Amino acid sequence: MKKDVNSSNLITVGTVIILMLALIIALFVIKPQAQESVTDAVKRTNEQAVNNFLVLGRDAAAGLCDVIMLASVNTNSGDVNIMQIPRDTYFDCSASTYKKVNGAYNSLGSAEAFSQSLSEALGIRIDYYLSLDLSVVAKMIDAVDGIEVNVPLNMDYEDPAQNLFIYLKAGKQKLDGKRAVEFLRYRSGYVTGDLGRIDAQKLFLNAFAKRLVEIGNPLSLFNVFKLICNNGETNIKEQDLLSIGLKCAKTKGGRIFYMTAPGEAIQSNVSGVWYYILSKQSMVKLLNERFLMQESFDKQNKFVDKNVKSFYDIYNKFCDIRIYTADEIENNEININ
């Protein structure tokens, strides 16, 4: 994939999903004694204990989603799974000639429509969605007094025309809101391009989750949650999130798992455009095990152009699935290059 920095793309509304998940984790620690208040939106049988969230990070000007994340919360085990979908993923969801998943919001017109289309293509139920212009990210980080991130490499980038200047040294350091956003926007130095940026997001997400747990005050966390929801497009209600958290609090505890949707990047030999092609076999395995798959995967072939052999070859082969625990990320066991 191309390795560039587009200054208009404010990255990682994935912070939002971690905020919600951290609320749940905080509830693990605090173990409130209040009775569960169950809303209709989160009533599940034991077989339907998985709540799936779609989180979108949008560039308000262009309308493209540079961050697409699915997160599942299992209220039986307390486990949370976060799957990042690369922005260059091939996704034919409308009559538009633009066939990347990051353009689906523009093509379909809303987060709700995007959620429905992605739900049908993946074969899973998506219960909640949240789309956010990431200009609020710096305020979020400053609201928690910064986060400590192990920056994987020296990050130096200048674009005076866009008023973008990034100077971060490799190593563990505390980032305020401004520098955190710079960390998230950077991608020119990763050998693996956008996949490297996605892995760096995992460092950020884990650091933010850790910081929110350190705060440990559910009221303070909900205040940040309100800040986010007041600036986003969402169907998430506070009582729904609290209900999910209370369910998880009754478990013996849970873990957070991070993963990138399995597939491979490939350049079109016609247009020269880079795409990321999902592996059908690998996605089916992952969705079945962690996101409560309910329908067949990609019944309408939205994730592949069957007329392009190189795309179809990737789509039909098994690609590696790498899943990281929070501890592995904390211990620098993720190789970012």
Label every PLM stretch briefly:
Residues 2-337:
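Non-catalytic, solvent-exposed segments at the cell envelope interface
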